[in-house]
């Protein structure tokens, strides 16, 4: 891999030769016990990464597809407050607009989120909060623990985009009160 470009982006990522070779093997039966054992092991490992004992669902799709699935299944028809301080928060807001009454709580891109504005939105009846933990487009890490605590205090659901933080930073979904 020394002569290959080093991609310093969220994805795609360079793959070592051993990974590429493993991917070139014959496919296994996705309904068989071998696959079931592999899947169960993956879920157990992912639960540690996510900091959760709750159910996990592996989706075949992009991060945007996963965020749309979260909003479509948990926020449809609800009053949604979307915290935005970068491209992916904006994308999550645009998704939320299609599924509920979405309110954008925007900060300047790369600036800290306004938790007082979130508190006011929750007091006004917001039922769901969306946020991006690590806003890749601006390089800012948002205070997921504090945001989830505010949502929980007001009985609102917290949907967190952890696409670039899980596996690279501490994520404790259960302890913080992140729902999805």
Describe each model-derived feature in a short phrase.
Residues 7-9, 20, 30:
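N-terminal/domain-start segments enriched in small and hydrophobic, helix-friendly residues
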Residues 2-5, 9-15, 41, 58, ...:
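Conserved PLP-enzyme active-site core in the AAT-like
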Residues 18-23, 158:
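Short alpha-helical interface patches
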């Amino acid at each position: 891999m020394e002569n290959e470009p080093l991609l310093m982006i969220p994805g795609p990522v360079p793959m070592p030769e051993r990974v590429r070779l493993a991917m070139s093997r014959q496919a296994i039966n996705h309904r068989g016990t071998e696959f079931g054992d592999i899947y169960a092991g993956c879920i157990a490992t992912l639960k540690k990464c996510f900091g959760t004992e709750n159910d996990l669902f592996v989706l075949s799709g992009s991060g945007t597809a996963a965020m749309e699935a979260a909003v479509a299944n948990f926020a449809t028809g609800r009053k949604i407050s979307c915290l935005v301080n970068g491209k992916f928060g904006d994308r999550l807001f645009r998704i939320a607009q299609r599924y509920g009454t979405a309110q954008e709580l925007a900060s300047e891109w790369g600036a800290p989120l306004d938790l007082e504005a979130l508190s006011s939105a929750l007091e006004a009846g917001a039922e769901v909060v969306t946020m991006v933990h690590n806003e890749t487009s601006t390089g800012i890490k948002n205070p997921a623990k504090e945001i989830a605590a505010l949502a929980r205090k007001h009985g609102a659901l917290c949907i967190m985009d952890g696409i670039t933080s899980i596996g690279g930073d501490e994520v404790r979904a259960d302890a913080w009160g992140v729902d999805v």
